[in-house]
Amino acid sequence: MIAAQAKLVYQLNKYYSERCQARKGAIAKTIREVCKVVSDVLKEVEVQEPRFISSLTEIDARFEGLEVVAPTEFEVVLYLNQMGVFNFVDDGSLPGCAVLKLSDGRKRSMSLWVEFITASGYLSARKIRSRFQTLVAQAVDKCSYRDVVKMIADTSEVKLRIRERYIVQITPAFKCTGIWPRSAAQWPLPHIPWPGPNRVAEVKAEGFNLLSKECYSLTGKQSSAESDAWVVHFAEAENRLLLGGCRGKCLSVLKTLRDRHLELPGQPLNNYHMKTLLLYECEKHPRETDWDEACLGDRLNGILLQLISCLQCRRCPHYFLPNLDLFQGKPHSALESAAKQTWRLAREILTNPKSLDKL
């Protein structure tokens, strides 16, 4: 048993150093190329409208606010200033979303975003995005990369196609530090020892972001007043929780397997599903010793089995917001074929670790 475990860990480490590192290297190169173009577009936006200041900065070889959705798909979060005159209201009526309401006694004119405040006093995510979309469309025509960048039409999101190969979504957002959403109040679960109190305090101080983008739970209802809502987003908090042990390596292997074998019609699975299931696995195995290098095979196997279970039940709850189902709106047939394909993959890895050489 121990010999089989060791063999799997050896093969996974080999897979990590060959396949995963190659994937990371290729993505890092793409990011540099993409960020040059996006920075140029955002510089042009800022000239037209100084309230939209580019926050895409490189820190320690990483771009702040950039997320890899897939090897050719990225999201850049553009942090906006001056949320101060608004209250964060999160009553659970829109899973995964919240609204920003003008604080009592505050005048609209005190806000930097006065023309985007609705009659009821809400700062409209949709109106800000619509204005930003117009500015980006103009910037694309003027910027020095105009020959290689195009706006993607037929969406309320701000999406660029670069060199006909890459897609970048630019999302206006507010950073909320020092507060924690009521809809995530159940976290951490009282009977689970992971993460410890110090890490919990760090994560809650890190806070979350509010993004102006279409919400999972609102698909199909975007024309209603609810589309003024903002999407609650925990990327920094999640990244902080996944520090230490073999968690990062495990996520890297999962993403690489997904990119190579689970990119299926109907797009049932993305890398965020993998990250979410890794967080649940951390709760199931709360001791740091459970995340030693020697346990990499067990943890990966546990996550793949949990993924199959979620796909079969057609439900994948968000880690911090369990009322939000990350499979909502996905075609049932796509989830079914993903379950079968994940099962084939898990069985292959478990029964024949050497198959990783070909995966």
Curated annotation (Swiss-Prot):
Which gene underlies this protein? Answer: mab21l2-b
Q: Which Pfam families would you find in this protein's record?
A: Mab-21, Mab-21_C
State its role: Required for several aspects of embryonic development including normal development of the eye.
Provide this UniProt record's keywords sorted from A to Z.
Answer: Cytoplasm, Developmental protein, Nucleus
The family line of this record is: Belongs to the mab-21 family.
Which top-rank group of organisms is this from?
Answer: Eukaryota
Kindly give the InterPro entries that the UniProt entry links to this protein.
Answer: Mab-21-like_nuc_Trfase (IPR046903), Mab-21_HhH/H2TH-like (IPR046906), MAB21L/cGLR (IPR024810)
Disulfide bridge partners, by residue number: none
CC terms in the record's Gene Ontology section: cytoplasm; nucleus
**GO BP, sorted A to Z:** eye development
What phylogenetic lineage does the species belong to? Eukaryota, Metazoa, Chordata, Craniata, Vertebrata
Location of this chain's protein in the cell: Nucleus; Cytoplasm
The protein's name: Protein mab-21-like 2-B
